[in-house]
Amino acid sequence: IYIADVPTPIFLPFGYFPLTQNRATGFIFPSVGQNNDRGYFIQNGGYYFAPSDFFDVTLLADYYTNGSYGFRAESKYKVRYKYTGSLSLRFENLINGERGLPGYSKNNIYNIRWSHSQDSKSNPNSRFSASVNLGSSNYFRESVNQLNTPNFLNNTLNSSVSYSKTFRGYPSVNLSLTASHSQNTRTQTVNMSLPTLQANVERIYPFVKRNGQKKGILKNINLQYSLRGENRIQTSDSLFLKKEMFNDARYGMKHSIPLSTNFKFLKHLSVSIGGRFEEIWAGQTIKRNDYDVINQIQGKKDTIKGFDRFNKYNFNASIG
């Protein structure tokens, strides 16, 4: 800097930093290394691009000199004031040993992750959310990609996808539909609920107007209705997402209608009367055979497939 044409040792730092609001498209440089079982490798190399302002895509790949390879596709999306989420698809083809020698094996493993959340203000009457983590039970244990190392000790995979909606009016109806998944990566057992359906109708007074005065035994009669249906599946990792996993599905539905009323008796006593009706629909039932008294053998249980139904009733009353 010159002051009055006299040079001084003082200087001002200067730099140019271009700022952009757009995401840059380009190649992702891979990491290079060596694995004792699969030779030299390149990992996590690929390409990134953003087709629009609402989502982007990352494509990555791995390759090992023994022939093993892996692919990953990841995407993040967001629509302002509506929803946001991410999706990850991972696949690896792993080769162990050398072809023609003992110990040679070839294995495909995969993992799927999806998260989705809805802005609470986008639609107050309906909501959709998802948190999915499913795939091969041995994915995180056998994957040789460095990105999966933190999940090596993960023993469970859980997923849940739900949708709920409220139908306004009188009576209002709340409806929810949920699919869930729980997977033990050690025992390779998979438990699912595909789906669980719930519906609830608000309390109604059939013998009085909506905002009318409720007096007497008749006008105080009120009832509700609720429904719950579920389809449960227990299977193994080897049968997951195959048609055989539906062979032992257990499904059913329960209808419930509570009914009650209250009134004054002798001006000072309050009387409450109520009851409940339930009907259960089942896709299969269990028949218990009689106990064998002579041989002292407990009767066997037979599973009978096919639709069946039964009812339950109860009644209650109180004075206070």
Q: Each predicted region: which residue ranges?
A:
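Outer-membrane beta-barrel proteins and related beta-barrel translocases across Gram-negative bacteria
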Residues: 1-320
